[in-house]
Amino acid sequence: MAGSDTAPFLSQADDPDDGPAPGHPGLPGPMGNPKSGELEVPDCEGLQRITGLSRGHSTLIVVVLCYINLLNYMDRFTVAGVLTDIEQFFNIGDGSTGLIQTVFISSYMVLAPVFGYLGDRYNRKYLMCGGIAFWSLVTLGSSFIPREHFWLLLLTRGLVGVGEASYSTIAPTLIADLFVADQRSRMLSIFYFAIPVGSGLGYIAGSKVKDVAGDWHWALRVTPGLGVLAVLLLFLVVQEPPRGAVERHSGSPPLSPTSWWADLKALARNPSFVLSSLGFTSVAFVTGSLALWAPAFLLRSRVVLGETPPCLPGDSCSSSDSLIFGLITCLTGVLGVGLGVEISRRLRRFNPRADPLVCAAGLLGSAPFLFLALACARGSIVATYIFIFIGETLLSMNWAIVADILLYVVIPTRRSTAEAFQIVLSHLLGDAGSPYLIGLISDRLRRSWPPSFLSEFRALQFSLMLCAFVGALGGAAFLGTAMFIEDDRRRAQLHVQGLLHESGPSDDRIVVPQRGRSTRVPVSSVLI
């Protein structure tokens, strides 16, 4: 039996020692060159020939996509930067305030599969242009809502989800079709730097524009103008690359889209995709909760410590904590994303499971520091900021790595759909409900104590401690991902190269390339 496991498999030539056929560089992992577990990476000329774009143009496209990603997150967290003012203006409690983020995320979550389906089949550039133009108009409209119509603010924040859904499900797949291997990882890290930087700029812009204008409504009027510029850049700079071409062998036929139902079944049978999405869900839960509630929590901490006056109806609330938290978010995001990508890149040389293991380490490491940040807030605001800095840095290590995992375990014609359903899962169980849940728990706890500024602080403090527990669960999901990552990556590479085709609802069949040569294949590496 041991001999049969390494016998020539699917041979079309008499010479068992022949290498791969011309135009078919070594197969991935054990099916090709045993010295390399990666696809052969095209050089600059090869990428230019395949994509029809120069390296400079491809890099410029990534810069434009990064700018729009930054803008999306800047808009999302501008609201958090003026959250206390919104509470006072509309005279609402913590539960209703949490609904602002929940409604937006719910809309985003519902629309993501729609744009995922369209993004795998139609021109991605025009889909993004339309979505971002609509988002800019709705965001501008939300800044003119009178105080008696809070429901209208919720409606407009929900419609903002159209723009984010049209962009977030599609943009990473464009990067995947422009670059491969380490080049792709580097470009994804640049793209995902925009998330923490944009989030931090949202806090800063929201608080500072409010201070300068004397009215929080003006904070919501900054990003729509920048959105118009984003649409122009998309239209003039971005070009649609062929899907999956940079990963195919020169002799392999292009992949054709399958039905939406077939895509869903294939993704559900991909344990690396499912488990990494669950791990990312915990990241979304924690970041969504902190994004909305951390500035308010820090303000309440300062009030309890006697460092700032309380925010009373009719008064302008202190914006210093929004500014500081925004700066921390920017710095920790850049540091965390960069550290995560670099550590993972170095560890991959020795361990092919490095990506999920780094993600697990980041989440498991962040949990105790977030707990300490909350526990110390009653005694020292400086210690709280230090622990938040460390916790958010570890948490940010996941962003680019999770995106890279999805792109190499899912075939190109399913990537937008996979992005969409990762968004649905991470928001459905993550930040769609976490801000509202934290606010609801805070309200319930506060009602059980005598009214005071201390009870407001303690209620939010105890409710936010849920984040540390959820972060630990996410770390466990990434440890599970590490068990399957090698096999799922190899399967996706075989599909792209035309060596593994689906023939039924649950079976895969190996097909011989048209110019097939004798190849020694461990059967155990194929029948997975």
Swiss-Prot record:
Region of interest (Disordered), residue spans: 1-38
InterPro entries: MFS, MFS_dom, MFS_spinster-like, MFS_trans_sf
Modified residues (N-acetylalanine): A2
Positions carrying Phosphoserine: S518
TM ranges: 60-80, 98-118, 126-146, 160-180, 187-207, 218-238, 278-298, 323-343, 357-377, 381-401, 421-441, 465-485
The keyword Metal-binding belongs to this UniProt entry's keyword annotation: no
A GO BP entry: regulation of lysosomal lumen pH
Catalytic activity: a 1-acyl-sn-glycero-3-phosphocholine(out) + H(+)(out) = a 1-acyl-sn-glycero-3-phosphocholine(in) + H(+)(in); 1-hexadecanoyl-sn-glycero-3-phosphocholine(out) + H(+)(out) = 1-hexadecanoyl-sn-glycero-3-phosphocholine(in) + H(+)(in); 1-(9Z-octadecenoyl)-sn-glycero-3-phosphocholine(out) + H(+)(out) = 1-(9Z-octadecenoyl)-sn-glycero-3-phosphocholine(in) + H(+)(in); 1-(5Z,8Z,11Z,14Z-eicosatetraenoyl)-sn-glycero-3-phosphocholine(out) + H(+)(out) = 1-(5Z,8Z,11Z,14Z-eicosatetraenoyl)-sn-glycero-3-phosphocholine(in) + H(+)(in)
Keywords in alphabetical order: Acetylation, Lipid transport, Lysosome, Membrane, Phosphoprotein, Transmembrane, Transmembrane helix, Transport
Source organism, top-level taxon: Eukaryota
Similarity comment text for this entry: Belongs to the major facilitator superfamily. Spinster (TC 2.A.1.49) family.
Annotated protein name in UniProt: Protein spinster homolog 1
Organism: Mus musculus
Classification of source organism: Eukaryota, Metazoa, Chordata, Craniata, Vertebrata
